[in-house]
Amino acid sequence: MLLLVAPEQEPVQSTAPLFTERCPAGFPSPAADYTEEELDLNAYCIRRPAATFFVRAIGDSMKEMGLHSGDLMVVDKAEKPMQGDIVIAETDGEFTVKRLQLKPRIALLPINPAYPTLYPEELQIFGVVTAFIHKTRSTD
């Protein structure tokens, strides 16, 4: 089952502070006490609200690139699919999220080596995945 969620036509602006200091993934340093600007996640993730929808990922064929089952994908159906893009596609009546290969032959590539490459005879691309949203803590 594929769950599609369309954003509001005019996203409500909701900002949070964006700190100028980068946060190292190693040993922490004291954080600065100031912000560079306000960050609106709608503006950051959604370039074209009327052409954007959200899809929840299911499965683990793309986990090596950080897309896990249950993650939310931001998909822009107005983006022109290009070599190497992550796309939402339909092939053989099934929806899938895969990396698009255009040359030398059209293929849908899983990132997880446990899954086969798909060489569809017919392919419809519904949009280009422009962002993943991954929660690190359950909200239950």
UniProtKB/Swiss-Prot annotation:
One of its GO terms (cellular component) is protein-DNA complex. Involved in UV protection and mutation. The active site is at S61 (for autocatalytic cleavage activity), K98 (for autocatalytic cleavage activity). Transmembrane segments: none annotated. Its EC number is 3.4.21.-. InterPro entries: LexA-like (IPR039418), LexA/Signal_pep-like_sf (IPR036286), LexA_repressor (IPR050077), Peptidase_S24_LexA (IPR006197), Peptidase_S24_S26A/B/C (IPR015927). GO terms for molecular function: DNA-binding transcription repressor activity; sequence-specific DNA binding; serine-type peptidase activity. GO terms for biological process: DNA repair; negative regulation of DNA-templated transcription; proteolysis; SOS response. Pfam families: Peptidase_S24. This is Protein SamA. Keywords: Autocatalytic cleavage, DNA damage, DNA repair, Hydrolase, Plasmid, Protease, Serine protease, SOS mutagenesis, SOS response. The gene is samA. Belongs to the peptidase S24 family. The record marks A25, G26 as: Cleavage. SUPFAM superfamilies: LexA/Signal peptidase.
